[in-house]
């Protein structure tokens, strides 16, 4: 068994939210194009690694728990907000630097939608999922066991 540190996932949420806020600030004026390439890729690196941990390890581990409430809550949240990795990958592929330059307003609108979805996911996980995961962990270390 390998352990997943819930505190580390929370720290990753903070880092992702900070980069997302910087990107949101950069797109705040749809009439004033900004250099956003570095921010987008920084967010992509952090977010995709984080989502892989959650989607491939945390959610399945919670869905294997003996407690029906834990299993159904994890499954419900994943069904409601679990498609973010695919949506974000499509967003990154669709918005090349050249296309961003040509269609800044469209990029701002699409970025706003993806950042809103990200904020909703982080909020749901921080309010519901992470406390649930901590309730089934070993209590002392903030870790949940996973097969590995």
What do the PLM-derived regions correspond to, one by one?
Residues 1-148:
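Small-residue-biased structural context
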């Amino acid at each position: 068994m390998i352990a997943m540190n819930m505190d580390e996932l929370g720290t990753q949420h903070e880092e992702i939210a900070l980069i997302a806020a910087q990107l949101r600030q950069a797109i705040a004026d749809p009439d004033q194009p900004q250099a956003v390439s570095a921010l987008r890729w920084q967010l992509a690196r952090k977010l995709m690694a984080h989502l892989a941990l959650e989607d491939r390890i945390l959610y399945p581990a919670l869905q294997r728990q003996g407690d029906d409430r834990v299993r159904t809550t994890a499954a419900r949240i994943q069904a409601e907000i679990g498609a973010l990795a695919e949506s974000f990958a499509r967003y990154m592929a669709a918005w090349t630097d050249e296309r961003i330059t040509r269609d800044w307003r469209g990029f701002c609108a699409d970025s706003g939608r993806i950042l809103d979805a990200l904020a909703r996911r982080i909020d749901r996980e921080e309010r519901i999922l992470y406390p649930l995961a901590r309730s089934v962990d070993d209590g002392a270390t903030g870790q949940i066991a996973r097969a590995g």
